Structures are given as C-alpha cells and as structure tokens.
C-alpha cells in the first residue's frame, strides 16, 4: 500500500490547521475577477464561502479541543450565519461588518448556487464580501491563536 500523498493532520493544535486551510482558500480568491463572460465568477464565491466556513469551524475545533461547549446543537454545514452565531456563543467576538454581509454569502453557500446552476434573485459582486471575509479571518485567528 502506498503512503498517502499528504500526511494526516496530527498537529497538537488542530484549530490552526483548519484556519490555515481557510487562508489557503481565501488566498486563491484574491485577484480573481468578479465577472467572467458576463456571469458572476462562481468559483470565487465558493472559495470565499468555504474560507469563511473553515475559519468559523476553526473556532469550533478550538472550543472542542479545550473542552468547551455552547448551548444548543451545532448548526448543519453551509449555514454560515448560524455557524457564526454558534461560534460567537463559544466566545468569538462578534463583528458588525461580518454580521452585515455574512447573511448574503451564507445564502449563496447554503443553496449551493456557486456550485450548481440555479436561479437566485439578486447576487452581489463577490468583491463586496472581501472586507468581511478578511475581518472574519482576523477575528477567528485572534480567537484561536496561542499566546
């Protein structure tokens, strides 16, 4: 049997692995155009939304590693707004910029519009979310980093 190309995640602080992966997705979205052939650049939306999901999940992994629990059940995948609220219940500092814009990106992510052709009323230009995504990555990093 061949060894895996990539070793399994065995870091003593797995939340850092989740956050590093979030940054990879965010970095790939940088510089991509918002519109391609007259259509929204759906891969850019996917990269941004997935970066957000992984960054939020880094907070959840951090809490789980520390033995913390939030009230209620963890929200399902792809509902970025609910995941963010859950992470805030675990101590992540709420950010008004993120709250204002996350609902729109969450809707696109939750309905898989960026992955599969579907009709969705109004779609915001992906670069409108850049500042909120960067703020979220900064906030989650501040929350999980080892001091």
Predicted regions and their residues:
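Helix-loop segments that flank and shape redox-cofactor active sites
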Residues: 27-43
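Short N-terminal helix-initiation segments at or just after the protein's N-terminus
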Residues: 20-21, 58
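Short, hydrophobic, well-ordered secondary-structure elements
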Residues: 41-61
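Long, charged low-complexity segments
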Residues: 1-20, 26, 64-147
């Amino acid at each position: 049997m061949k060894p895996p190309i990539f070793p399994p995640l065995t870091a003593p602080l797995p939340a850092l692995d989740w956050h590093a992966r979030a940054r990879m997705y965010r970095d790939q979205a940088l510089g991509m155009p918002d519109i391609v052939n007259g259509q929204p650049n759906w891969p850019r939306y996917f990269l941004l939304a997935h970066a957000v999901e992984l960054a939020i999940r880094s907070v959840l992994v951090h809490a789980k590693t520390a033995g913390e629990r939030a009230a209620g059940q963890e929200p399902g995948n792809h509902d970025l707004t609910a995941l963010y609220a859950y992470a805030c219940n675990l101590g992540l500092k709420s950010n008004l910029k993120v709250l204002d814009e996350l609902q729109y990106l969450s809707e696109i992510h939750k309905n898989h519009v960026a992955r599969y052709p579907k009709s969705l009323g109004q779609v915001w230009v992906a670069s409108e979310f850049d500042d909120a995504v960067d703020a979220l990555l900064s906030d989650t990093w501040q929350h999980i980093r080892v001091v």
